[in-house]
Design a protein with these regions (language model features):
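Single conserved hydrophobic/aromatic residue that forms the stacking wall/gate
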Residues: 184-190
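All-alpha prenyltransferase/terpene-synthase fold signal
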Residues: 1-183
Length: 190
């Protein structure tokens, strides 16, 4: 596939993902599969397309471009999950105000997970909090997300996607760019 076709396909998928997300606003029956379909179109697709197209522009083979597409997919999913967590835990001073997605009724994976895990009165409580959300219900929401293990579940998924992305990079043919990947980062130096 050439770069123009890749970008055109990505743009189509962004629009499809946005429409899917709109159809799931406030939908407490949204599944993890629905969630991934939404983010794969509107967030992940641009990451995957960008990394694959960059590989082709740099003269990489079709095989390497496909690997970079898979890398971008995993990286984009990790990015979106981090964004979901920051929406629930963010600090405006860090540039991410808390609660934008919740106020808009967007069903993020931590919310979907909690709705799946909680049962009985706890699930009913969460459904009420989400359906009638206001800033004075933050403590209720975060308590229910903690109770369901949704924060730790999402953090584990982020780590899984990062690990898969790094595994893909480790399988790329040797190159100068790979030296950057294998060099220790300042964070790793202690």
């Amino acid at each position: 596939m050439d770069i123009v076709d890749m970008i055109a396909s990505s743009c189509t998928n962004i629009a499809r993902g946005e429409l899917q997300q709109f159809n799931h606003i406030g939908d407490l029956t949204t599944t993890p599969e629905d969630y991934y379909s939404i983010i794969d179109g509107k967030t992940v697709g641009p990451f995957a397309t960008g990394t694959a197209a960059a590989a082709l522009v740099a003269g990489a083979s079709e095989e390497v471009s496909e690997m970079m597409y898979e890398f971008g997919t995993e990286f984009g999913r990790a990015f979106q999950l981090v964004d979901d967590l920051l929406d629930l835990t963010g600090d405006p001073e860090m540039g991410k105000p808390r609660g934008t997605d919740v106020h808009e009724g967007k069903m993020t994976l931590p919310l979907i997970h909690a709705l799946t895990i909680l049962h009985g009165s706890e699930r009913e409580h969460l459904a009420d909090v989400l359906s009638n959300f206001s800033d004075d219900r933050w403590n209720e929401l975060t308590s229910l997300l903690e109770l369901s293990g949704s924060f730790s579940y999402t953090r584990q998924l982020i780590q899984n996607h990062v690990d898969r992305a790094l595994d893909i990079l480790s399988k790329l043919p040797p190159s100068d760019a790979c030296l950057l990947y294998t060099s220790p980062s300042p964070r790793d130096r202690g």
